[in-house]
Amino acid sequence: SLNLNSGKILIIGKNAQGKTNILESIYFLSALKSPRTSNNIEIINFNAETAEIEAELVKANTSVTLDYSYSKEKTRILKVNGVKTTPKNFKQVLKTVLFSTNDLLLLRGNPSDRRDWLDRAISQIYPAYDERLSKYDKIRIQKNNFLKELIKGVPLDETLLEVLNEQLTITGSNIIYLRIKFLAEIEKIAREKHRIISETEELKLVYDCSFLDGETELEEIAEKFRGALEERKIEEMRRAQSCVGPHRDDILFYINENEATKFASQGQQRTVVLALKLSELDIITEKTGDEPVLLLDDVLAELDDLRQNYLLKSITNATQVVITSVDTLLFENEFLKGVKIYKIEDGRIVEEL
């Protein structure tokens, strides 16, 4: 049990003491997935049968309790105020923005990492977006299975492929449309933050889709998607997999018109990620009216003084932030005045008075 009723929480301790587990638990209650693994079985202690997370929070001056449990039999129970609920409703209660050392590799990571970042941010603003992603994946898997059977020579009605492609077009076009729209909105905020940190550099975000050439309207995207599926139909049948769609797209970052992934220094890339994370915090607050909890997982030690100072000064009194660090040396005394500090050692956590 841990009381996080202060606006600013600092958890200090050596590595492998459990600091990250606390942030992961908070994040889990907002995303229903771990930031480090896609297999929820891995969050269960080796000697336990279930994983349970309970939290009480105040939202709009009203107390709300969240209860999550997951068993090794893959049984999941979600409750809000003691009443069972759906994943969609559960995830609407708590919003978080996680900034960890892994995020610093966002620009040079896999396209799937950048898609996950974008999708996670969008889903906190538009709860139905998660359902579209799930629906798209189900249709895509069904199509891939159909193509695998087809390549084996199993006699199948190929009109089913046309039906699946049309379903992919409708659902996938909606996903792409929302991604492009959100990216344009967050770019406006991120450009300004990036300009302040870097002083002179201009940031640009580009949604990279193989079959689009600047189209942004839903009908245009759907038409292009439909055409791309038809154009690559033979290739997909030969490879037995879906070759085009939002599951193959990427997000490109440019600094002064140069692609950051290829040409930016480590410091420049970290400036981009810092601007993105703080912009994510702002846009979620602006769109939903809910201030997300900012989770900073050992990330300050990886930033230079300029970026550290900008990050800490960006944390307003309205923002609840939970920070993990090996010690308090990175923080100015003025910042620490309003911070509740906990120390964790050997799995035990105590408040520093």
Ranges and model annotations:
Residues 55, 320-327:
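Structural recognition of the conserved hydrophobic beta-strand(s) that form the central parallel beta-sheet
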Residues 1-6, 26, 39-40, 118, ...:
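Long, non-coiled-coil amphipathic alpha-helical linker/lever segments
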Residues 30-107, 111-113, 117, 122-125, ...:
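Nucleotide-state sensing region of NTPase/ATPase domains
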Residues 297-299:
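Walker B catalytic acidic pair
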Residues 1-14, 155-293, 302, 306, ...:
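Conserved NTPase motor "head" modules and their coupling/switch loops across ABC/AAA+ ATPases, GTPases
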Residues 20:
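Walker A/P-loop
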Residues 97, 322, 340-342:
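Hydrophobic/aromatic beta-strand patches that form the interior of the parallel beta-sheet core
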